[in-house]
Protein backbone atom coordinates (compact mmCIF):
# COMPACT_ATOMS: atom_id res chain seq x y z
CA UNK A 1 0.00 0.00 0.00
CA UNK A 2 1.41 3.36 -1.00
CA UNK A 3 1.18 6.18 1.55
CA UNK A 4 0.52 9.76 0.59
CA UNK A 5 3.11 12.38 1.47
CA UNK A 6 0.91 13.59 4.36
CA UNK A 7 0.50 10.07 5.70
CA UNK A 8 4.24 9.50 5.44
CA UNK A 9 4.84 12.61 7.58
CA UNK A 10 2.24 11.69 10.18
CA UNK A 11 3.33 8.06 10.56
CA UNK A 12 6.57 8.78 12.51
CA UNK A 13 4.65 11.22 14.72
CA UNK A 14 2.06 8.57 15.59
CA UNK A 15 4.80 6.09 16.46
CA UNK A 16 6.43 8.70 18.70
CA UNK A 17 3.15 9.41 20.51
CA UNK A 18 2.50 5.71 21.11
CA UNK A 19 6.06 5.27 22.38
CA UNK A 20 5.62 8.15 24.80
CA UNK A 21 2.35 6.73 26.10
CA UNK A 22 4.01 3.37 26.73
CA UNK A 23 6.89 5.11 28.46
CA UNK A 24 4.53 7.00 30.82
CA UNK A 25 2.67 3.77 31.61
CA UNK A 26 5.95 2.12 32.56
CA UNK A 27 6.93 5.08 34.76
CA UNK A 28 3.58 5.01 36.56
CA UNK A 29 3.86 1.28 37.13
CA UNK A 30 7.16 1.41 39.07
CA UNK A 31 7.93 2.91 42.51
CA UNK A 32 8.59 6.65 42.36
CA UNK A 33 11.41 6.81 44.88
CA UNK A 34 14.44 4.86 46.05
CA UNK A 35 12.56 3.90 49.21
CA UNK A 36 9.99 2.00 47.17
CA UNK A 37 7.11 4.34 48.01
CA UNK A 38 4.36 4.80 45.45
CA UNK A 39 2.64 8.07 44.58
CA UNK A 40 0.02 7.73 47.33
CA UNK A 41 2.68 7.05 49.96
CA UNK A 42 4.78 9.97 48.74
CA UNK A 43 1.80 12.30 49.07
CA UNK A 44 1.28 10.99 52.60
CA UNK A 45 4.97 11.51 53.36
CA UNK A 46 4.65 15.11 52.13
CA UNK A 47 1.65 15.57 54.43
CA UNK A 48 3.68 14.36 57.41
CA UNK A 49 6.66 16.50 56.40
CA UNK A 50 4.46 19.61 56.16
CA UNK A 51 2.97 18.91 59.59
CA UNK A 52 6.38 18.35 61.21
CA UNK A 53 7.87 21.50 59.66
CA UNK A 54 4.85 23.55 60.71
CA UNK A 55 5.01 22.19 64.27
CA UNK A 56 8.71 23.07 64.43
CA UNK A 57 7.92 26.62 63.34
CA UNK A 58 5.15 26.96 65.94
CA UNK A 59 7.46 25.65 68.66
CA UNK A 60 10.10 28.17 67.58
CA UNK A 61 7.56 30.99 67.81
CA UNK A 62 6.55 29.84 71.31
CA UNK A 63 10.21 29.90 72.41
CA UNK A 64 10.67 33.40 70.93
CA UNK A 65 7.50 34.64 72.63
CA UNK A 66 8.67 33.44 76.03
CA UNK A 67 12.12 34.96 75.48
CA UNK A 68 10.62 38.36 74.62
CA UNK A 69 8.32 38.19 77.66
CA UNK A 70 11.41 37.64 79.84
CA UNK A 71 13.46 40.43 78.28
CA UNK A 72 10.99 43.19 77.35
CA UNK A 73 10.31 46.14 79.66
CA UNK A 74 6.59 45.40 79.42
CA UNK A 75 6.82 42.12 81.32
CA UNK A 76 10.43 41.29 82.24
CA UNK A 77 10.21 42.40 85.90
CA UNK A 78 7.21 40.17 86.62
CA UNK A 79 8.48 37.26 84.52
CA UNK A 80 11.94 37.31 86.12
CA UNK A 81 10.28 37.43 89.55
CA UNK A 82 8.17 34.35 88.78
CA UNK A 83 11.21 32.55 87.35
CA UNK A 84 13.21 33.20 90.53
CA UNK A 85 10.28 31.98 92.62
CA UNK A 86 10.10 28.84 90.50
CA UNK A 87 13.84 28.23 90.92
CA UNK A 88 13.40 28.63 94.70
CA UNK A 89 10.60 26.03 94.49
CA UNK A 90 7.96 28.53 95.57
CA UNK A 91 4.85 26.39 96.09
CA UNK A 92 2.44 28.77 94.33
CA UNK A 93 4.53 29.07 91.16
CA UNK A 94 5.60 25.41 91.03
CA UNK A 95 2.03 24.16 91.51
CA UNK A 96 0.81 26.65 88.91
CA UNK A 97 3.28 25.51 86.27
CA UNK A 98 2.59 21.85 87.03
CA UNK A 99 -1.10 22.35 86.30
CA UNK A 100 -1.19 23.33 82.63
CA UNK A 101 -4.74 22.88 81.36
CA UNK A 102 -3.56 20.01 79.13
CA UNK A 103 -1.96 18.12 82.04
CA UNK A 104 -5.13 16.00 82.33
CA UNK A 105 -4.13 14.30 79.07
CA UNK A 106 -2.22 11.08 79.56
CA UNK A 107 0.85 11.74 77.42
CA UNK A 108 3.93 9.49 77.06
CA UNK A 109 7.15 10.53 78.79
CA UNK A 110 9.39 8.05 76.97
CA UNK A 111 9.58 6.50 73.53
CA UNK A 112 8.81 3.12 75.08
CA UNK A 113 5.55 4.49 76.50
CA UNK A 114 4.73 6.13 73.17
CA UNK A 115 5.05 2.83 71.30
CA UNK A 116 2.36 1.30 73.51
CA UNK A 117 -0.19 3.79 72.18
CA UNK A 118 -2.01 2.82 68.99
CA UNK A 119 -1.60 5.13 65.99
CA UNK A 120 -5.27 6.26 66.05
CA UNK A 121 -5.02 7.07 69.77
CA UNK A 122 -1.72 8.85 69.22
CA UNK A 123 -3.31 11.09 66.58
CA UNK A 124 -6.27 11.68 68.88
CA UNK A 125 -3.88 12.85 71.62
CA UNK A 126 -2.18 15.34 69.28
CA UNK A 127 -5.56 16.64 68.12
CA UNK A 128 -6.63 17.11 71.75
CA UNK A 129 -3.55 19.22 72.51
CA UNK A 130 -4.08 21.43 69.46
CA UNK A 131 -7.80 21.89 70.10
CA UNK A 132 -7.14 22.66 73.77
CA UNK A 133 -5.13 25.74 72.72
CA UNK A 134 -7.72 27.20 70.36
CA UNK A 135 -9.51 29.29 73.00
CA UNK A 136 -6.46 30.23 75.15
CA UNK A 137 -4.55 31.62 72.16
CA UNK A 138 -7.53 33.72 71.10
CA UNK A 139 -7.94 35.20 74.59
CA UNK A 140 -4.19 35.65 75.03
CA UNK A 141 -4.06 37.79 71.89
CA UNK A 142 -7.23 39.69 72.83
CA UNK A 143 -6.02 40.57 76.34
CA UNK A 144 -2.53 41.53 75.16
CA UNK A 145 -4.11 44.00 72.73
CA UNK A 146 -5.87 45.71 75.62
CA UNK A 147 -2.79 45.86 77.89
CA UNK A 148 -0.91 49.15 77.88
CA UNK A 149 2.65 48.76 76.65
CA UNK A 150 2.26 45.27 75.21
CA UNK A 151 4.95 45.08 72.49
CA UNK A 152 3.99 44.35 68.90
CA UNK A 153 6.70 41.66 68.74
CA UNK A 154 4.75 39.57 71.27
CA UNK A 155 1.34 40.30 69.75
CA UNK A 156 2.54 39.36 66.26
CA UNK A 157 3.97 36.04 67.43
CA UNK A 158 0.92 35.07 69.48
CA UNK A 159 -1.30 35.87 66.48
CA UNK A 160 0.93 33.83 64.17
CA UNK A 161 0.87 30.88 66.57
CA UNK A 162 -2.93 31.10 66.74
CA UNK A 163 -3.26 31.06 62.93
CA UNK A 164 -0.69 28.32 62.37
CA UNK A 165 -2.20 26.18 65.16
CA UNK A 166 -5.47 26.12 63.18
CA UNK A 167 -3.61 25.19 59.99
CA UNK A 168 -1.73 22.41 61.78
CA UNK A 169 -5.01 21.12 63.18
CA UNK A 170 -6.34 20.72 59.62
CA UNK A 171 -3.15 18.87 58.63
CA UNK A 172 -3.52 16.46 61.56
CA UNK A 173 -7.16 15.80 60.66
CA UNK A 174 -5.95 14.69 57.21
CA UNK A 175 -3.33 12.48 58.84
CA UNK A 176 -6.04 11.04 61.11
CA UNK A 177 -7.84 9.76 58.03
CA UNK A 178 -4.65 8.00 56.94
CA UNK A 179 -4.35 6.13 60.24
CA UNK A 180 -8.07 5.28 60.24
CA UNK A 181 -8.99 7.49 63.18
CA UNK A 182 -12.62 8.54 62.87
CA UNK A 183 -12.92 12.27 63.56
CA UNK A 184 -15.82 13.24 65.78
CA UNK A 185 -17.14 16.80 65.76
CA UNK A 186 -17.72 16.82 69.52
CA UNK A 187 -14.57 14.98 70.52
CA UNK A 188 -13.50 15.94 74.04
CA UNK A 189 -10.34 17.90 74.80
CA UNK A 190 -9.01 19.73 77.90
CA UNK A 191 -10.82 22.99 78.63
CA UNK A 192 -8.88 26.11 79.61
CA UNK A 193 -10.51 27.80 82.62
CA UNK A 194 -8.22 30.70 83.56
CA UNK A 195 -9.77 33.57 81.65
CA UNK A 196 -10.69 35.31 84.92
CA UNK A 197 -7.02 35.40 85.97
CA UNK A 198 -5.96 36.72 82.57
CA UNK A 199 -8.57 39.50 82.81
CA UNK A 200 -7.92 40.26 86.49
CA UNK A 201 -7.50 43.86 87.63
CA UNK A 202 -4.67 42.61 89.85
CA UNK A 203 -1.50 43.12 87.84
CA UNK A 204 0.41 40.24 89.42
CA UNK A 205 -2.44 37.79 88.78
CA UNK A 206 -2.73 38.93 85.18
CA UNK A 207 0.98 38.62 84.51
CA UNK A 208 1.21 35.24 86.21
CA UNK A 209 -1.58 34.03 83.90
CA UNK A 210 0.52 35.20 80.94
CA UNK A 211 3.65 33.64 82.45
CA UNK A 212 1.89 30.31 82.88
CA UNK A 213 0.36 30.43 79.40
CA UNK A 214 3.72 31.15 77.76
CA UNK A 215 5.32 28.29 79.71
CA UNK A 216 2.54 25.78 78.98
CA UNK A 217 2.45 26.85 75.33
CA UNK A 218 6.17 26.13 75.00
CA UNK A 219 5.75 22.72 76.69
CA UNK A 220 2.82 21.69 74.49
CA UNK A 221 4.23 22.94 71.17
CA UNK A 222 7.42 21.03 71.95
CA UNK A 223 5.38 17.89 72.68
CA UNK A 224 3.42 18.18 69.44
CA UNK A 225 6.62 18.52 67.42
CA UNK A 226 8.19 15.41 68.96
CA UNK A 227 4.96 13.41 68.88
CA UNK A 228 4.54 14.12 65.16
CA UNK A 229 8.08 12.91 64.47
CA UNK A 230 7.33 9.75 66.44
CA UNK A 231 4.05 9.25 64.56
CA UNK A 232 5.79 9.70 61.21
CA UNK A 233 8.44 7.11 62.10
CA UNK A 234 5.84 4.56 63.16
CA UNK A 235 3.55 5.17 60.19
CA UNK A 236 6.39 4.47 57.76
CA UNK A 237 7.54 1.38 59.70
CA UNK A 238 10.57 3.02 61.24
CA UNK A 239 12.75 3.66 58.21
CA UNK A 240 12.27 7.43 58.63
CA UNK A 241 13.80 7.22 62.11
CA UNK A 242 17.24 6.61 60.60
CA UNK A 243 17.30 10.24 59.49
CA UNK A 244 18.90 12.41 62.25
CA UNK A 245 16.23 15.04 61.56
CA UNK A 246 13.58 12.58 62.73
CA UNK A 247 15.25 11.39 65.92
CA UNK A 248 12.69 11.29 68.74
CA UNK A 249 13.12 13.01 72.07
CA UNK A 250 9.82 12.88 73.92
CA UNK A 251 9.25 15.30 76.80
From Swiss-Prot:
GO biological process: cell surface receptor signaling pathway; female pregnancy; mammary gland development; positive regulation of lactation; positive regulation of receptor signaling pathway via JAK-STAT; response to nutrient levels
An annotated Gene Ontology molecular function: hormone activity
Subcellular location: Secreted
Disulfide bonds: 100-216, 233-241
Pfam families, per database record: Hormone_1 (PF00103)
Glycan-carrying positions: 73
Keywords from the UniProt entry: Disulfide bond, Glycoprotein, Hormone, Secreted, Signal
Family: Belongs to the somatotropin/prolactin family.
Name used for this protein in its record: Prolactin-7B1
Originating organism: Rattus norvegicus (Rat)
Gene name of the record: Prl7b1
